[in-house]
UniProtKB/Swiss-Prot annotation:
InterPro entries named in the record: FUS1
Organism: Caenorhabditis elegans
GO cellular component: mitochondrion
Region (Disordered), start-end ranges: 1-28
Listed name of the protein: Uncharacterized protein C09E9.1
Length: 123
């Protein structure tokens, strides 16, 4: 649903750019090429690029109207002459939001072998 001239045209990449190990362009590189370059940096320099780390994630906790923080909230209810039972509260809760990690963690979908164990050669 747009005009024919509203689409942006991409320019072909320049062939004269030198290929370096440490720098990766995200805009022009395909994801598999980018991962391969990062893996090469990991092998040659022994460092872990920032691309493989997660600094914050969505929290699974909720905040109720009193400001208490928990994964689930329950309320004890009792009707006329019945047993007491716990009912899960679903109303008036808001998600905690994103949580920043004190120590960055590895992404779960890294397609690179970070540590490889080799069997000792018997002579």
């Amino acid at each position: 649903m747009g005009l024919g001239s509203s689409k942006r045209k991409e320019e072909p990449p320049h062939k004269s750019e030198p290929k370096t190990v440490g720098r990766v362009k995200r805009a022009g590189a395909r994801p598999d090429e980018m991962i391969a370059k990062y893996a090469e940096v990991l092998k040659t320099r022994g460092i872990l690029p920032e691309y493989f780390l997660v600094h914050e994630a969505k929290s699974s906790q909720y905040i109720d109207e009193d400001g208490d923080v928990a994964n689930e909230f329950y309320q004890e209810t009792m009707s006329d002459g019945e047993k007491r039972r716990l009912c899960r509260l679903m109303k008036n809760l808001r998600p905690k939001g994103k949580e920043r990690y004190a120590i960055p963690r590895l992404k779960h979908d890294i397609p690179v072998v970070i540590w490889e164990v080799q069997q000792p050669q018997e002579t």
